[in-house]
Amino acid sequence: MTRLAVLPPLAGGLMGLAAILGALLLLGLAVWAWRDRQFESTASVADAYDRWTDDQLLERLWGDHVHLGHYGSPPQSVDFRRAKVDFVHELARWSGLADLPPGSTVLDVGCGIGGSARILARDYGLQVLGISISPGQIRRARALTPADLNCRFAVMDALALDLPDASFDAVWSVEAGPHMPDKQRYADELLRVLKPGGRLAVADWNRRDPAVKPLNRLERWVMHQLLVQWAHPEFASIPGFRRNLEQSPYARTADSQPEGTPWLVDTADWSRETLPSWIDSIVEGLRRPGAVLGLGPQAVLMGLRETPTLLLMHWGFATGMMQFGVFRGRKSA
């Protein structure tokens, strides 16, 4: 058989595959446009994460870390799952949690399925309590955690923590803030349960400070999509959430600082270091097609349904409309 005889069927097969993929993408876009996940209450956040956990798609593609990766500065070519693990270690070092003595207690607010909590317990010898509003995430976190690892998990609302004041040596929270309708209350609860001298580590998706540059018409549309597609009531800016932390009544103890003395919070922008995560989140489905196809047609559709939001997130962070803020502080002793 000549090469010319082979080309037409091969070309036809590729065109057919492209047509199928195109149709699936259009179907995913239709679902994306027709049915959003607009924030209504904490129950809507819990429901969204229960569904994301129960369908297993995120875990099969991303492993046990439902957060962005850290690719170095400048960003390097790193395996997506490796970058997620590296992120935990980078934030632990930057915030000072890595310097805590073994046995120190840590609260992980918005723990997902426990990936960060297990690293903090296993690699740093810390005692970790992970909390999430999603019962599905907590069930999965418990199932993935070895019995001999010093990790516990509980269903709890981050805006009404059922925990005593000053009960943890450190508080850790990664990418939970966008789901909080009351940013000041969120900051207050993080600091309320932190012991005097305790360390705070927060990482979040933030919007550009509107006082520096308001959103233009295109950015307002993109921002609306980023809010309604993933159950976000609002994004704080980096300086805005820093003020929430510094102005909290729990930022200082009665004996440590006189009234009006600020509790200083350090911040940094890790947008560049985490930016490759958004495209990798999509490419991971191509690298591991069996992980998606093995879950059936609905998983394929749901993967396609998330693609537009991932692309908009990449655009937002690449253009500076969004920023990946990290926050650290040490509560006055």
Predicted regions and their residues:
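A short glycine-rich, Lys/Arg-flanked "PGG" loop and its adjoining helix->strand segment in the class I
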Residues: 184-199
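Acidic carboxylate diad motif detector
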Residues: 202-204
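A short acidic, Gly/Pro-enriched loop at the edge of an enzyme's catalytic core
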Residues: 159-170
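Conserved alpha-helix/loop element of class I SAM-dependent methyltransferases that forms part
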Residues: 81-102
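Class I SAM-dependent methyltransferase SAM/SAH-binding core
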Residues: 107, 113-160
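N-terminal auxiliary segments of SAM/dcSAM-dependent transferases
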Residues: 7-59
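Substrate-binding/catalytic lobe of Class I Rossmann-like enzymes that use SAM or dcSAM, i.e.
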Residues: 214-300, 305-321
